[in-house]
C-alpha cells in the first residue's frame, strides 16, 4: 500500500548546490545532511554524473520520518584545466518503503511501479 502514496519531501543541507574549491590536487570531502521530512519511511539512493571524480558514502539507505543522515561527497584529484567541469551533479532518489519492510535498503524498491522522487544538486567547481 505504501506505493500508492507519493513519497514525502526531503530536505538537504546544503539545499541547492555543492561547491568544491581549488586546488584540485588533493581530495576534497563535503558533507550533506539529508532529512526525511515526510511521514513515511523512505529508501534513498545517490547517483552521480561523474563516477570517476565523485564518490558518495553512504550511497544509499533508509530513513524513518524526521530522521536524518550525514553523507560524505568526495571529489578526487583532477586537472581542472583539462577536464569538463560544467555538468557534474549528484541526484538523490527516494521512494516509500513497502509496509512492513525491514529497515534495510533494497534496490528493487526503485524498480517497481511505485513513485520515485528526485532532487538534483549541481556541483560547482571554483577555480
Swiss-Prot record:
Domain MSP: 9-126
PROSITE patterns according to UniProt: MSP (PS50202)
GO cellular component, as recorded: cytoplasm; cytoskeleton; pseudopodium
Compartments (UniProt record): Cell projection, Pseudopodium; Cytoplasm, Cytoskeleton
SUPFAM superfamilies (alphabetical): PapD-like
One Pfam family from the record: Motile_Sperm
Keyword Cytoplasm annotated: yes
Top-level taxonomic group: Eukaryota
Keyword Cytoplasm set for record: yes
Residues annotated with N-acetylalanine modification: 2
InterPro entries with a match to the protein in the record: Ig-like_fold, MSP_dom, Nematode_MSP, PapD-like_sf
Role summary: Central component in molecular interactions underlying sperm crawling. Forms an extensive filament system that extends from sperm villipoda, along the leading edge of the pseudopod.
Entry protein name: Major sperm protein 2
Organism: Onchocerca volvulus
Amino acid at each position: 500500500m505504501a506505493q500508492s502514496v507519493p513519497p514525502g519531501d526531503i530536505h538537504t543541507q546544503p539545499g541547492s548546490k555543492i561547491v568544491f574549491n581549488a586546488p584540485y590536487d588533493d581530495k576534497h570531502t563535503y558533507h550533506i545532511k539529508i532529512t526525511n521530512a515526510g511521514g513515511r519511511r523512505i529508501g534513498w539512493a545517490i547517483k552521480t554524473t561523474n563516477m570517476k571524480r565523485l564518490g558518495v558514502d553512504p550511497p544509499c539507505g533508509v530513513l524513518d520520518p524526521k530522521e536524518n543522515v550525514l553523507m560524505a561527497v568526495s571529489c578526487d584529484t583532477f586537472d581542472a584545466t583539462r577536464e569538463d567541469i560544467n555538468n557534474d551533479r549528484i541526484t538523490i532518489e527516494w521512494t516509500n518503503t513497502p509496509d512492513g519492510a525491514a529497515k534495510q535498503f533494497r534496490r528493487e524498491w526503485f524498480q517497481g511501479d511505485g513513485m520515485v522522487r528526485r532532487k538534483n544538486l549541481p556541483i560547482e567547481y571554483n577555480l
